[in-house]
């Protein structure tokens, strides 16, 4: 059965200065609670999908944008009234089987985003996020990381959300080109509708000009 969101809470599990996981606790409409633990990569995947939908909302005309924002604010207020409690013991004795190994956006149509979470024990959970809940969910994730005084991590996982790297190339001194490719799942490709190539020039430590792209 799909998990819908009534309220969310987040907390960071860390060891010394090292980020281990983000705890994401969800209160469902019938007050059942589900707890997941997400690594940096899965958080980035989630945020990329959320940011893509927010980008669509930013392109609305003024009247539609106002209508969306008013509806969003009502939902955010309701979510704030239904924040589930995260117990210290749930963080200290985190169940590894609740760790999210992979996250996939399987439905991006309509008002809801549907994700399939594959957990450490091999089980799968379907998580449904309404577009009016996106900002509250994203805010809760970033707030938890900042609250753990890991602002560099917050910047790292939020900065590359508006593009998807596919290739890079270095121009070698002998004139050859050295390519690297980045394999991305199809659902990420589907979030973007145009491609850009960037070529830049820089000087290396010896002062020689180099080219990359």
Residue ranges and their predicted role:
Residues 51-87, 160-162:
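Charged surface patches that recognize polyanionic ligands
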Residues 1-20, 75-117, 168-208:
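Intrinsic, low-complexity N-terminal interaction/targeting segments
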Residues 156-169:
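Intrinsically disordered, low-complexity charged/polar segments
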Residues 29, 86-88, 120, 164:
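A near-ubiquitous, low-amplitude feature marking generic local secondary-structure context
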Residues 14-21, 25-67, 113-157, 204-213:
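Extended intrinsically disordered, low-complexity coil regions enriched in Ser, Thr, Gly, Ala
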């Amino acid at each position: 059965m799909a998990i819908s969101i009534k309220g969310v809470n987040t907390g960071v599990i860390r060891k010394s200065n090292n980020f281990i996981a983000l705890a994401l606790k969800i209160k469902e409409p019938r007050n059942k609670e589900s707890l997941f633990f997400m690594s940096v990569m899965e958080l980035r995947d989630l945020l990329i999908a959320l940011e893509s939908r927010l980008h669509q909302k930013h392109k609305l005309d003024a009247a539609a944008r106002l209508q969306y924002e008013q509806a969003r604010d009502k939902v955010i207020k309701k979510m704030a009234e239904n924040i589930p409690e995260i117990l210290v013991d749930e963080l200290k004795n985190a169940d590894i089987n609740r760790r999210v190994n992979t996250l996939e956006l399987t439905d991006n149509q309509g008002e809801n985003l549907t994700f399939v979470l594959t957990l450490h024990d091999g089980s799968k959970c379907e998580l449904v996020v309404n577009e009016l809940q996106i900002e509250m969910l994203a805010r809760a994730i970033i707030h938890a990381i900042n609250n753990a005084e890991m602002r560099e991590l917050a910047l790292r996982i939020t900065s590359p959300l508006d593009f998807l790297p596919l290739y890079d190339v270095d121009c070698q001194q002998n004139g050859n080109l050295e390519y690297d490719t980045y394999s991305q799942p199809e659902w990420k490709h589907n979030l973007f509708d145009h491609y850009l190539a960037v070529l830049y020039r820089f000087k290396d430590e010896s002062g020689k000009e180099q080219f990359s792209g």
